[in-house]
């Protein structure tokens, strides 16, 4: 039996969706890279694709989906209970290394999502 995962996008408190915004810009500027990244996100639904060359662990629970085109296109994500993948940040860069500030943005968004997710669960428990 193949284990499938749901892929979700992080949203800010204000309702902005940075990964969707990143993908929308990519669709206009580099349609081929956009198509490859969207196909990669779809492949992440299959557990067998959670490793290289499509995906790579970065530490602290974060992973990257990577597409090499004119520039390296990366989407950072993490696992969540219930077979969920949460995509938190997307970047394009020329180098192989991930800039520290981009990793920090991805980590902050992951921690923000986790904080809000667990606060919501606590609200439901207290209502029971």
Where do the model's predicted regions map?
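Basic, Lys/Arg-enriched alpha-helical interface segments
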Residues: 1-72, 81-85, 92-128
């Amino acid at each position: 039996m193949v284990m499938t995962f749901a892929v979700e996008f992080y949203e800010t408190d204000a309702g902005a969706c940075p990964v969707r915004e990143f993908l929308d810009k990519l669709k206009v500027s580099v349609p081929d890279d956009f198509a490859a990244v969207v196909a990669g996100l779809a492949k992440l639904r299959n557990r067998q694709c959670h490793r290289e060359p499509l995906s790579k662990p970065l530490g602290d629970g974060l992973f990257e989906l990577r597409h090499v085109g004119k520039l390296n296109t990366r989407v950072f994500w993490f696992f969540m209970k219930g077979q969920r993948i949460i995509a938190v940040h997307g970047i394009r860069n020329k180098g192989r290394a991930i800039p520290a500030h981009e990793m920090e943005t991805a980590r902050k968004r992951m921690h923000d999502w986790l904080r809000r997710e667990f606060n919501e669960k606590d609200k439901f428990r207290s209502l029971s």
